[in-house]
């Protein structure tokens, strides 16, 4: 018996751990396929809560809960069979209170399910708050908001405690109720069985044996309350996990067409593109792009100019299909993006976003992310003016970076992400304000190196700095989501329109910054003389 019980425990616990392992892998694989709209509507803390607490609850349901339920069933059948052999009438009377078990289990089980779901939802909120504070720890300290954030977290934690206590109180009722039913059954057996034994219906020995079998039946039934609790928790958590598993990206290619091979860059064309970010049902969308049309021939460099909020980043996000436009279409080498195989499309694009995301790994590992070989990422580091900077680190390319590259400056992170994109040798290079944190001289050196690299890649550069676009083959000026001007740098300046206004504003900002630096230098000189 002991060996059998050990074998059952080993089998079920191993199986539950394996299910947890497979489910975690499946969840992560699904998350990697979901589009930007999903992550825009779902908090990171909520996802993390599902991958930890909910997954653990499912494991407990398919492991310990199944084990105790199996033990209850087999133990119950064994005990009832021997009780029937001793006295069927007394067995029926003993089992009479157990008729209430399904009713209680169903009613309280639903309440447990709902309360545990509420607990898990609030745990997601709590996790999100903690994650945001840890990610923004420097901002919290800089604004001296430590106490305010502690108070906010404490209020959320109080609510989490209250929901947990509500769940615990309900579960606390379930266990004694099952114990009460077991006690009633025991009282019936002692009263009626004792009377039957005194009248000689069966022997005292049979009465004692019957009582022992009843005890064997009662303890598993009392534990059934815990099993119901685990099953309801697991069901609620599995429902939350299915929300991820059932999610699908809306960006899969219609036909999955492969791109024809290309020696250099590719032709990118926007035809009457209109776009707004996804909004909840019933809300009015705010159009970010309206009727945008332009062509970037293979091997050309097109600049996208515009003030903050003009739609530059949204336009760039549409090319690798992080989102799809609601109006118009975008074509790559004459093929609509929606018809292309998504992996093949993105494999030929190097995208450097405004946010310089760096992984917690070595510089070499970050540069090699998606690169074909060491030679490619070493050359890319040189083009991005990063090689000399890396040479200053003691461990050079093996320097371990902190979370999100915390031990790098903003400019260093931008150059690292640029080098990472270049290392893929993409046919289309997208730079979305990718050099905003570097000085204008370094920016000019990088752009000059890209022009003289000798490859014929297509480049689309979005920037609020006009200086980054002056050498582009064609410039598109966005204003309020519309393409209001087209042309080369000199042509647009001669018109005196929106592009000219952007340049004048930039020159004014630069002159103020230069004046401030000169003023500081003058102060430093005067203090030295004094």
Residue ranges and their predicted role:
Residues 1-21, 29, 40, 93, ...:
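Transmembrane-helix motif of ABC transporter permease domains
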Residues 17, 45, 49, 53, ...:
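Short active-site loops of ABC-family nucleotide-binding domains
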Residues 31, 153, 241, 270-272:
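Conserved catalytic Walker-motif region of ABC-type ATPase nucleotide-binding domains
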Residues 36-37, 53-62, 66, 70, ...:
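An intracellular "coupling" helix at the cytosolic face of ABC transporter transmembrane type-1 domains
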Residues 64-118, 189-202:
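Transmembrane helices of ABC transporter permease
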Residues 82-96, 166-239, 244-245:
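Helix-loop-helix
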Residues 261-530:
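ABC-type nucleotide-binding domain
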